Amino acid sequence: MSLKAIHVSEVPSLDHFPENPSLICSSRKANNKFVVVGHRGHGMNMSQSPDLRFSALKENSILSFNAASKFPLDFIEFDVQVTRDGCPIIFHDDFIYSEEQGVVYEKRVTEVCLSEFMSYGPQRDTGKTGKPLLRKSKEGKIHKWSVATDDSFCTLQEAFEKVENPNLGFNIELKLDDNVFYSSDHLSRLLLPILQVVSDIGNDRTIIFSSFHPDAALLVRKLQTTYPVFFLTNGGTEMYHDTRRNSLEEAIKVCLEGGLQGIVSEVKGVFRNPALVNKIKESKLSLMTYGKLNNVAEAVYMQHLMGIEGVIVDHVEEITEAVREMMKPSNRDADGTKPKPNFSDRELSFLLKLIPELIQH
């Protein structure tokens, strides 16, 4: 990949992106493909959840990525940040928490060097003991980051080198802090090292970039045209100072004005505004979703009926199996076009009106 100098005809995608990088569904429709993406690999961690699946494997780790690759996923999604010394690493949170002599402390991930980042948690060298790894919940509580099967942190380069399935796509989320102002120069310093790794060792792996930060998404599109860029949005389920982040309508504008290829919305944002699915498709943009509801097979099935092209999920095993059953030829009508149950337009319209009411609670 030569930054700023790649012809659009070389753009790959969720299903070998067409020369005009628009819809995933342009090729998806040809083979009725519904894309399933593993969230942070095999699923995110929520150590305090009673559901043990959320604490089975360390998220965003090579262990998690390779475990996810055993299932019929199209992509794994993971979060990339850049350390103080310019190394792209895979980690979700803005801060890393640890404890020394009973005192909890935090450090901003982008302000530590690679060697310090790698010193937290399990160590690859069996003779070393890593620093204790803690985590801050959304409620502000600090707790031990415990999982049943742990693994060390990893870099973006290692993901390319150690994820065993070469056909498993990478959805690289460009992770930035919502509470930090980034100038264009600052964004460039953060994005270029990531793009360089992809250029050097991306090889033939299918890749898409995504970001909640509109300027980061727009800039990565300007810096390269090899890989599609998706704008992540809460779809209006949360409010931000930057109004571009506050609705699906604004997300459409960002994509169309910046030449982005698609939107990844919180699924509740789509269910609350189902009419926008057609508007997004008419704009020749791809649409995928993320969120806890995507761990519910019925919610995933409803999205398939609505024309949404894919989902990011935590419960990889359960949802890939549900999608496999959903797409079986034996579960279709005689013409092979509509999976059962086959809702009438009136029934589907009723369901789409009902869902926004249900998810308000």
Curated annotation (Swiss-Prot):
All copies of domain GP-PDE, residue ranges: 54-323
Tissue-level expression: Expressed in roots, shoots, rosette leaves, stems, flowers and siliques.
Cofactor: Mg(2+)
Domain of life: Eukaryota
Record's note on what induces expression: By senescence and phosphate starvation.
Gene Ontology biological process terms from the UniProt entry: cellular response to hypoxia; glycerol metabolic process; intracellular phosphate ion homeostasis; lipid metabolic process
GO molecular function, one term: glycerophosphodiester phosphodiesterase activity
Enzyme class of the recorded protein, top EC level: hydrolase
Disruption phenotype: No visible phenotype under normal growth conditions, but mutant plants show reduced glycerophosphodiester phosphodiesterase activity under phosphate starvation.
Record EC number: 3.1.4.46
Span of the transit peptide along the chain: 1-53
InterPro entries: GDPD, GP_PDE_dom, PLC-like_Pdiesterase_TIM-brl
Keywords: Chloroplast, Glycerol metabolism, Hydrolase, Plastid, Transit peptide
GO cellular component, one term: plastid
Xref: Pfam families: GDPD
Cell compartment(s), UniProt: Plastid, Chloroplast
Swiss-Prot/TrEMBL catalytic activity: a sn-glycero-3-phosphodiester + H2O = an alcohol + sn-glycerol 3-phosphate + H(+)
Keyword Plastid on entry: yes
Protein purpose: Hydrolyzes glycerolphosphoglycerol, glycerophosphocholine and glycerophosphoethanolamine in vitro. May be involved in release of inorganic phosphate (Pi) from phospholipids during Pi starvation.
Protein family (similarity comment): Belongs to the glycerophosphoryl diester phosphodiesterase family.
Record's protein name: Glycerophosphodiester phosphodiesterase GDPD1, chloroplastic
The encoding gene: GDPD1
